């Protein structure tokens, strides 16, 4: 259960400000480590600032979600959600300048398949990469090399509670105990869209899965012109607890605001930041702590098998929708 889980105890935070402090601290610690090795000065322009790291994390997180969306065989949503949560957690306490998000995102997806018992072999997994057989072999080597590191940085807290199960539970409850809404299934598509959008925000690190699921349903109802506050007050028995009801409504409002204010990284900004990132990981600087024993990816041209022709803003190394 979520309320007795490591997710609640260790990976659910009080505010966006707390998340920002953790990320800034990870950035500062890496800079101190890099300066200590004598290869760079404290104010060297090679360093990424915390807000630049966050932009890159957003970019690679979106690519992770898109990679999972075109994965063959189809990847269950719970696996996608788990991979996304691993990625968010990892970069709360680590810098992209030390561990490249390109390989971390794949390692997150690979580990999520194992933990959620999605039966995919290693060759099947890397077979989803737009790479030659040799490139796929190298990718698998790096994934396996980073897997233990990822597990350690997650503090061995591998069970993730996603909002998808409580979402289905709420729909069943509405069908059973809320006759005012004749066909709750009409809410599903818009609610699914909301869950997809909120996965790109920090909501998974701030709110409970059931709060996210309920917000998705009520947001969908609101967009359809359906008022469901009586479901909260009557069916969920919050009528007598106005304080709890008010707090829940505030939480849902905060989540909707997270979705509204989310801005995807601009392609021109990402291009500049990726150049800085590759500079941090170049062999002459060697800022990253993990010694690369094997050759890994030298670019991002690996994420699916067919380029998406209709989106001109994507370059040929971007994640694409295929099939």
UniProtKB/Swiss-Prot annotation:
Domain of life (superkingdom): Eukaryota
A Gene Ontology BP annotation from the UniProt entry: regulation of transcription by RNA polymerase II
Keywords, alphabetical: Cell cycle, Cyclin, Nucleus, Phosphoprotein, Transcription, Transcription regulation
List of residues that carry Phosphoserine: 5, 132, 304, 322
A single GO molecular function term of this UniProt record: cyclin-dependent protein serine/threonine kinase activity
Membership in a protein family: Belongs to the cyclin family. Cyclin C subfamily.
Function (record text): Regulates CDK7, the catalytic subunit of the CDK-activating kinase (CAK) enzymatic complex. CAK activates the cyclin-associated kinases CDK1, CDK2, CDK4 and CDK6 by threonine phosphorylation. CAK complexed to the core-TFIIH basal transcription factor activates RNA polymerase II by serine phosphorylation of the repetitive C-terminal domain (CTD) of its large subunit (POLR2A), allowing its escape from the promoter and elongation of the transcripts. Involved in cell cycle control and in RNA transcription by RNA polymerase II. Its expression and activity are constant throughout the cell cycle.
Protein name per the record: Cyclin-H
Organism encoding this protein: Mus musculus
Encoding gene (name): Ccnh
């Amino acid at each position: 259960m979520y309320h007795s889980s490591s997710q609640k105890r260790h990976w659910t935070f009080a505010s966006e400000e707390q998340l920002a402090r953790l990320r800034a601290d990870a950035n500062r610690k890496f800079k101190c480590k890099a300066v200590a090795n004598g290869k760079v000065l404290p104010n060297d322009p090679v360093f990424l600032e915390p807000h630049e790291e966050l932009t890159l994390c957003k970019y690679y997180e979106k690519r992770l979600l898109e990679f999972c969306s075109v994965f063959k065989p189809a990847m269950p949503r719970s696996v996608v959600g788990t991979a996304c949560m691993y990625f968010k957690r990892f970069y709360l306490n680590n810098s992209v300048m030390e561990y490249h998000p390109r390989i971390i995102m794949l390692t997150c997806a690979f580990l999520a398949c194992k933990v959620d018992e999605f039966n995919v072999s290693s060759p099947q997994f890397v077979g989803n990469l737009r790479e030659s057989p040799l490139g796929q072999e190298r990718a698998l080597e790096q994934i396996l090399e980073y897997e233990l590191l990822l597990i350690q940085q997650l503090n061995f807290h591998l069970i993730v509670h996603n909002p998808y199960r409580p979402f289905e539970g709420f729909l069943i409850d509405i069908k059973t105990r809320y006759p005012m809404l004749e066909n709750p299934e009409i809410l599903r598509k818009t609610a699914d869209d909301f869950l997809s959008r909120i996965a790109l925000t920090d909501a998974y690190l701030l709110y409970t899965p059931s709060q996210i699921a309920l917000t998705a349903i009520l947001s969908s109802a609101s967009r359809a012109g359906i008022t469901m506050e009586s479901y909260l007050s009557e069916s969920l028995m919050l009528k007598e607890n106005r304080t709890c009801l008010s707090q829940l409504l505030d939480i849902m409002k905060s989540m909707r605001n997270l979705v509204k204010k989310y801005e995807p990284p601009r392609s021109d900004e990402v291009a500049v930041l990726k150049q800085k990132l590759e500079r941090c990981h170049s062999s002459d600087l060697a800022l990253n702590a993990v010694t690369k024993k094997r050759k890994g990816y030298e670019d991002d041209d690996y994420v699916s098998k067919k380029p998406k022709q209709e989106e001109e803003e994507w370059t040929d190394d971007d994640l694409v929708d295929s099939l």
